[in-house]
A protein has these predicted regions:
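Conserved acyl-donor/pantetheine-binding loop and adjacent beta-alpha core of acyl/acetyltransferases
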Residues: 58-119
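Helix-loop element at the rim of GNAT/NAT acetyltransferase active sites that forms part
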Residues: 1-26
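Conserved GNAT acetyl-CoA-binding A-motif
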Residues: 111-114, 142-156
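Conserved active-site alpha-helix within GNAT-family acetyltransferase domains
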Residues: 132, 144-147, 157-174, 181
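C-terminal "cap" of GNAT-fold acetyltransferases
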Residues: 149-158, 177-191
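Conserved beta-hairpin
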Residues: 41-61
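Conserved acetyl-CoA-binding loop-helix of GNAT-fold acetyltransferases
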Residues: 121, 127-140, 166
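A short helix-loop-beta-strand connector motif used in the catalytic cores of GNAT acetyltransferases and
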Residues: 30-48, 115
């Protein structure tokens, strides 16, 4: 899935050009692997679309929390996965990622919601409805969850803002991580 993020402005800034730089590619792969591991440890939703054995697109969504107990248990298990990541990514990269998380989470709505951590489609599958199908599934999941009042997400691509607005999202906050613009958006169900 790392190729799905090769032109992402945040990934380009934090990791470098993963299409041209093998070290950047290794860092992106390590980070995405960590995100998937974290998602399984915290019982987040990981959903994808396949063509036979080939993953075309996937998303990772944090669900609204009703209990802190699974997070505590997952947190202890996550530490064992975080330690190797510290040796795979530079200190600067870890600081930038931490800043990104802090800034974007502070822009999230105060009500219980699903948080779209990431959504990506392989370049050769883009424009074929894979992303739209994944978003439709996320909307169905959110509508079926009585705990959730909507969805929050962040994008660094200005052209994605209009795309998400067509799906019913509103721009909650616009900020920057150094020179990288970040658009924090929300979808509130039953408006």
């Amino acid at each position: 899935m790392s190729r799905a993020f090769s032109r992402d402005p945040l990934f380009m800034y934090v990791f470098g050009d993963s299409e041209l730089d093998s070290e950047a590619r290794k860092s992106v792969t390590a980070f995405l692997s960590f995100l998937f591991d974290k998602s399984f440890l915290f019982h987040e939703e990981v959903w994808g679309i396949f063509d036979e054995d080939s993953l075309l697109g996937t998303y990772v969504v944090e669900k609204p929390q009703t209990s802190k107990l699974p997070n505590i248990k997952g947190g202890f298990l996550l530490i064992s996965r975080l330690i190797p990541l510290v040796f795979q990514l530079s200190g600067k990269t870890l600081i930038l990622l931490n800043s990104y998380m802090r800034i974007t989470r502070s822009a999230a709505p105060p009500w219980k919601h699903h948080y779209l951590i990431m959504i990506g489609v392989k370049p050769e599958a883009q424009g074929k409805g894979v992303g739209k199908t994944m978003m439709q599934h996320l909307f169905q999941t959110t509508q079926a969850d009585p705990e959730s009042q909507g969805i929050a997400l962040d994008t660094e691509k200005e052209e994605n803002v209009a795309l998400y607005q067509k799906l019913g999202f509103t721009l909650r906050e616009q900020t920057k991580i150094d020179n990288v613009p970040v658009y924090c958006m929300v979808y509130q169900k039953n408006r």
